């Protein structure tokens, strides 16, 4: 079991859930730093996207997601269903990002129809 399937739905297409293992999550707390806050403050005056924060949050979400996958693997999961992200500010210069979902064990269903989104 090398890969854990992660989906935002309550099922995994082409698979049957055979066991629910419970809640799994991965989180990270990131500091925006003084320099980032100064640049962001200047950008808010001019308007537009604050690229420093976009990069920070994208990196933090990826870290939280990888930690969720590691946690699910440690539980013996083959998939995580209903995965969500949640973000909250802590103090003035820190942001917490958590990825969470339900760790499950799945097995492939023979002759299943693949879901195609258009």
Swiss-Prot record:
Protein name, entry field: UPF0145 protein PTO0347
InterPro entries noted in UniProt: UPF0145_dom_sf, UPF0145_YbjQ-like
Record family assignment: Belongs to the UPF0145 family.
Top-level taxon in the UniProt lineage: Archaea
């Amino acid at each position: 079991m090398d890969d854990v399937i992660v989906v935002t739905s309550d099922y995994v297409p082409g698979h049957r859930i055979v066991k629910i293992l419970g809640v799994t999550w991965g989180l990270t707390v990131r500091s925006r730093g003084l320099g980032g806050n100064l640049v962001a403050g200047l950008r808010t005056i001019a308007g537009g996207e604050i690229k420093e924060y976009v990069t920070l949050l994208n990196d933090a979400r990826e870290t939280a997601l990888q930690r969720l996958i590691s946690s699910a693997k440690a539980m013996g999961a083959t998939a995580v269903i209903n995965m969500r992200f949640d973000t909250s500010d802590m103090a003035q210069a820190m942001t917490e990002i958590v990825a969470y979902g339900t760790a499950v064990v799945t097995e492939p269903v023979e002759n299943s129809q693949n879901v195609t989104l258009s």
